[in-house]
Amino acid sequence: WDRHGVPVEYEIDKALGITGVKDIHDMGIRKYNKECRKIVLRYTKEWEAVVKRMGRWIDFRNGYRTMDRSFMESIWHIFKMLYEKGSVYRGHRVMPYSTACSTPLSNFEANQNYKDVSDPSILVAFPLRKPFKGYSLSLVAWTTTPWTLPSHMAILVNQSFIYAIFRLKSAFFIMQRDRVNVYFKDAVVISEVKGHELLHLEHDQPFMYYNHYREKGFFRVYHADFVSEIDGTGVVHCSPGFGEDDYKAMTMPGLIKENELLPSPLDENGRFNEEVPEYKGMHVKDADQSIIKDLGKKILYEGKVYHRYPFCWRSDTPLIYKLVPNWFVRVKREIPRLLESNSTINWIPESIGEHKFKNWLSEARDWSISRNRFWGTPIPLWHCDGKYICIGSIEELSRLSGRKIDDIHRENVDDVVICKDGEKYRRIEEVFDCWFESGCMPYAQRHWPFECDNLCLPADFVAEGVDQTRGWFYTMHVISTVLLAKPRFRNCIVNGIVLASDKKKMSKRLKNYPDPMDVINRYSADSLRLYLISSPVVMAENMCFSEEGVGEVLKTLLIPWYNCIYFYSECPNAGDQEQTRMDDWILNTLNTFGNKVKRDMSKYMLQGVMGYATSFVNDLSNWYIRLN
């Protein structure tokens, strides 16, 4: 049972009307976590009822819960092992950030929920401070995030592009040559320059914030490879506190060092703070139109862009990218070992391992594992003046602090102080990302190494949805490879997503799917199981659920099979007769059927079973019984 993390907190925040971290601190972490604890077991009985009725085997009696002390202690032990291997570090990175949940997300979380949306598309004029080529010019930059303009720090161009100086009415501007007529049909091109000629030119910022950065080399033109001539203007407004590419671009000329903080004038809820007083308290998305209005004549074009954009997988709200401090597991340096381990896994279908998972591993980044939240396993790091003590067990914390420790949620360990060499060490505030907990599950479910020293590594078999190639499969694979240099599992069946009959995601709000229990009670659990196991979903392909399809299984396979059983019950002495050639034929057919099933099952290939069974029952019912 996964019981921690943002999903639980988000439900509590909605129920209690909590709008930010301040509300939680005012309420008290102890009381807040008590509320979280109340709801995590809410649907346990309903879940057990459906699973048991489906005939799916799950060991409910010995199930693990991520909120249990034993599970959390194993996570501490695993983290300490990673920490002592030098596989953990703290850094400042531009991360996907959920303003609704007030926490950064990992890159694979951000990739889970993309939507087609429209955003503002504007062209902004940035006047150069000195004449260029004899003209008083303005650079024309394109952006779809007007809210980042108050924290503008530089202009980026591509030094290999050709740029055009053009006149628009009585003013002069410069942008990539081939993009001028896309936006300005009446523009008059005067001359052309190479991109490298624009480098280091000073320009005015759109808002007069952070002007003291000018003496450090900001508010100038720099090169970036990612600047495109396919869309936009070939001129990019750079806000390194809110863009990963922007941040990297500022490290190239040495303006900033890696992990250095830069202007990021937002609070944890995505609202402007006192650094930008004109928009203080406004959420970034709400501020777009106000910023466009205040820029006035600096806006040369205003329209809409339709594109795919990441949303928070839990709150379903747009993510932003924000420079935040975070704790990371070093994954990038482990890519060769991750790929080697992956090559030993039998993936079903094979293409998932050879392409989807392999490609994801090849581009893996260091893994953000800390969250600025409350209901989760606390990261066991105590710090003092840049020095850290990493704790790997409850006994170790009790021994070093002199306090008896029972539960290790935040409300019980945040005030624990470790005194060493006359200095007081206090715990950092972050908790683990719940995906880190999921990756630790194979060890923590057994309370390894405290009550169990057998890791059962690698596991024989694992199964989950195709989305877990960037989730659970990935986190288990990373932790096992980095920690123990072995793959976590031998065989992996990857299923697709079951969609509603209208091809949309199943939604309680839309009521676009039948109650599973109603389907089972109407057609039988076997009908539903056989329908699913014979569908494309067991080969990692999506499928649209059809209640009629379940009924068809009942009609074509199970009812004929039940009729066969009924027939034999009416002929109790049939086996006493001498064996005929028809008997030999049906026994041979049965043997062939069994061999096909064994062959496919040994390879974890499930999809053919329904076809084999239907064919055999047809032979049994329509030929053997009728003609014998």
From Swiss-Prot:
<dbReference type="GO" id="GO:0002161">
    <property type="term" value="F:aminoacyl-tRNA deacylase activity"/>
</dbReference>
<dbReference type="InterPro" id="IPR002301">
    <property type="entry name" value="Ile-tRNA-ligase"/>
</dbReference>
<dbReference type="InterPro" id="IPR002300">
    <property type="entry name" value="aa-tRNA-synth_Ia"/>
</dbReference>
<dbReference type="GO" id="GO:0006428">
    <property type="term" value="P:isoleucyl-tRNA aminoacylation"/>
</dbReference>
<keyword id="KW-0067">ATP-binding</keyword>
<dbReference type="InterPro" id="IPR009008">
    <property type="entry name" value="Val/Leu/Ile-tRNA-synth_edit"/>
</dbReference>
<dbReference type="InterPro" id="IPR014729">
    <property type="entry name" value="Rossmann-like_a/b/a_fold"/>
</dbReference>
<dbReference type="GO" id="GO:0005524">
    <property type="term" value="F:ATP binding"/>
</dbReference>
<dbReference type="Pfam" id="PF00133">
    <property type="entry name" value="tRNA-synt_1"/>
</dbReference>
<dbReference type="InterPro" id="IPR023586">
    <property type="entry name" value="Ile-tRNA-ligase_type2"/>
</dbReference>
<comment type="similarity">
    <text>Belongs to the class-I aminoacyl-tRNA synthetase family.</text>
</comment>
<feature type="short sequence motif" description="'KMSKS' region">
    <location>
        <begin position="505"/>
        <end position="509"/>
    </location>
</feature>
<dbReference type="InterPro" id="IPR009080">
    <property type="entry name" value="tRNAsynth_Ia_anticodon-bd"/>
</dbReference>
<keyword id="KW-0547">Nucleotide-binding</keyword>
<dbReference type="GO" id="GO:0004822">
    <property type="term" value="F:isoleucine-tRNA ligase activity"/>
</dbReference>
<keyword id="KW-0648">Protein biosynthesis</keyword>
<keyword id="KW-0030">Aminoacyl-tRNA synthetase</keyword>
<protein>
    <recommendedName>
        <fullName>Isoleucine--tRNA ligase</fullName>
        <ecNumber>6.1.1.5</ecNumber>
    </recommendedName>
</protein>
<feature type="binding site">
    <location>
        <position position="508"/>
    </location>
    <ligand>
        <name>ATP</name>
    </ligand>
</feature>
<keyword id="KW-0436">Ligase</keyword>
